[in-house]
Swiss-Prot record:
This is UPF0114 protein Shewana3_0644. It comes from Shewanella sp. (strain ANA-3). GO terms for cellular component: plasma membrane. It comes from the Bacteria. The keyword Cell membrane applies. InterPro entries: UPF0114, UPF0114_bac.
Length: 162
C-alpha cells in the first residue's frame, strides 16, 4: 500500500506539466501585446514627444522582462519539479538550463520582480505631475518592500548554502 501511495504521489508531479505549458500561452499573449504596441506607435512616432516615446519604450521593456520571467519559471520549474528537458545535442541549449535549483529560481524571480517594479516606478516618475502624492508614496513603499524582500531572500539563501 505504501509503495502504491508513493508512486502515485511521485507521478502527480506531472499535473504541473500542463500548467508550465499554459505559461507559454501567456508568453504568446505578451508577444501579441508587444507587437500591438509597436504597430500602434509606428504611424505616430514622428508626432510623439520624447517623454511619450520613453514611456512606450519602458512599457516594452516591462513586457520583455515579464516574458523573460515567464520563460525562466517555465523551464526551470519544469526541470526542478517535473522532468529534465531532453533537448538534443544538435539544438541550442540555454546555458542556465539544469543549473537553477528552487532557491536560485526564487532569487532570480525576486530580482526580476524588482526590475519590473523599477520600470513601473520610472514610468510613474516620468509622469509625476499627473499622479497624486499618495499614490506615489504607495508605489515607493511597495517597491521598497520588493527590494528588501529580494535582499532578504538572497541573504538567507547565501546563509543556508554555507
Amino acid at each position: 500500500m505504501e509503495k502504491i501511495f508513493e508512486r502515485l504521489m511521485y507521478a502527480s508531479r506531472w499535473i504541473m506539466a500542463p500548467i508550465y505549458l499554459g505559461l507559454s500561452l501567456v508568453l504568446l499573449g505578451l508577444g501579441i501585446k508587444f507587437f500591438q504596441e509597436i504597430f500602434h506607435i509606428l504611424p505616430i512616432i514622428f508626432e510623439m514627444t520624447e517623454v511619450d516615446l520613453v514611456l512606450v519604450t519602458l512599457s516594452l521593456i516591462d513586457i520583455t522582462l515579464v516574458g523573460g520571467l515567464i520563460v525562466m519559471v517555465m523551464f526551470s520549474g519544469y526541470e526542478n519539479f517535473v522532468s529534465q528537458l531532453d533537448v538534443g545535442e544538435d539544438s541550442e541549449k540555454l546555458s542556465w538550463l539544469g543549473k537553477l535549483d528552487s532557491g536560485s529560481l526564487k532569487n532570480k524571480v525576486a530580482a526580476s520582480i524588482v526590475a519590473i517594479s523599477s520600470i513601473h516606478l520610472l514610468k510613474i516618475f516620468m509622469d509625476v505631475k499627473n499622479i497624486d502624492n499618495d499614490k506615489i508614496m504607495w508605489y515607493l513603499l511597495i517597491h521598497i518592500t520588493f527590494v528588501v524582500s529580494a535582499f532578504a531572500m538572497g541573504y538567507l539563501d547565501k546563509m543556508t548554502r554555507k
